[in-house]
């Protein structure tokens, strides 16, 4: 289908940060705007030099090597670490789309590069806009067959968390497996969900500072899922219509729905990326 990405993204509000912006400021900006990713641009020419995403924050909070900024450089002093410039944890190898790209190229990029959004740039690599999986799904909702069900699109290999798991352990699981969200399960039943966006909400608000007394990051990374998980989870079931689930994602601004049976036992998960496979 020949639709330019700019037709979808032309009126999108674009929020950026600079390489010198502090991690704390970037977190606050992401939280205030409810964005999961921010392009990092040079102040002088608006050229894209990086991107910071919710998964970079998960990595920073114990999920991977970016945690070294806290643990080693600042000896676990969280308050010092979040005042470092965002260039310390941003992704420099940015997957972008050119302004003349079509929607099929965007879908292929999301599916093959495992990214949920991409800055749109001109030939000089200057930022023009940004397009996400949700933008594409919203634009193509009417193209989904009313009778198509989700069963062939469900991701069946689901990794879960438990209510007693600590934030740092869940962060490691997310980064290791490249998953942005984990259903939280107790005695085989779904009781909540934790997402990479939740990390932004926690750290970009007053929660982290209210939760700390010494400034040591362990006061945050040792928090259990039962304290921070989202309990009111929107779910799907096998046999649900794909279009209905896509509409729920767009309307409720969520990236995935756990698929459960009548006893709330996990059967899989369906994500925005899974929905995009319909158009591939």
UniProtKB/Swiss-Prot annotation:
Domain of life: Archaea
Annotated keywords: CBS domain, Repeat
Family annotation (PROSITE patterns): CBS
InterPro entries: CBS_dom (IPR000644), CBS_dom_sf (IPR046342), Diverse_CBS-Domain (IPR051257)
Cited SMART domains: CBS (SM00116)
Domain CBS stretches: 10-67, 90-146, 154-209, 229-280
Endpoints of the signal sequence: none
Keyword Repeat applies: yes
Protein name: Uncharacterized protein MJ1225
Naturally occurring in which organism (per UniProt): Methanocaldococcus jannaschii (strain ATCC 43067 / DSM 2661 / JAL-1 / JCM 10045 / NBRC 100440) (Methanococcus jannaschii)
Organismal lineage: Archaea, Methanobacteriati, Methanobacteriota, Methanomada group, Methanococci
């Amino acid at each position: 289908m020949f639709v330019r990405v700019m037709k979808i993204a032309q009126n999108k509000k674009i929020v950026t940060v600079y390489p010198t912006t502090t991690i704390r400021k970037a977190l606050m900006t992401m939280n205030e705007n409810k964005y999961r990713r921010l392009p990092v641009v040079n102040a002088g020419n608006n050229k894209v030099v990086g991107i910071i995403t919710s998964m970079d924050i998960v990595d920073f909070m114990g999920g991977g090597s970016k945690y070294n900024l806290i643990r080693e450089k600042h000896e676990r002093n969280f308050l010092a670490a979040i005042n470092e410039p965002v260039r310390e944890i941003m992704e420099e190898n940015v997957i972008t789309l050119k302004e003349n790209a079509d929607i099929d190229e965007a879908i292929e990029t999301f599916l093959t590069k495992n990214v949920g959004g991409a800055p749109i740039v001109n030939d000089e690599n200057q930022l023009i806009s940004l397009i996400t999986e949700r933008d594409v799904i919203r634009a193509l909702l009417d193209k989904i067959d009313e009778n198509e069900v989700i069963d062939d699109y469900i991701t069946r290999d689901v990794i879960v968390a438990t209510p007693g798991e600590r934030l740092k352990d869940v962060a490691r699981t997310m980064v290791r497996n490249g998953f942005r969200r984990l259903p939280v399960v107790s005695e085989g039943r779904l009781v909540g969900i934790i997402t990479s966006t939740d990390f932004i909400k926690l750290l970009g608000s007053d929660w982290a500072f209210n939760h700390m007394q010494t400034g040591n990051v362990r006061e945050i990374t040792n928090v259990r899922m039962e304290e921070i998980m989202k309990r009111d989870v929107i779910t799907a079931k096998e046999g649900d219509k794909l279009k209905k689930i896509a509409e729920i994602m767009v309307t409720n601004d969520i990236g995935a729905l756990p698929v459960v049976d009548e006893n709330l036992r996990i059967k899989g998960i369906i994500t925005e990326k899974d929905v995009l496979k319909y158009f591939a």
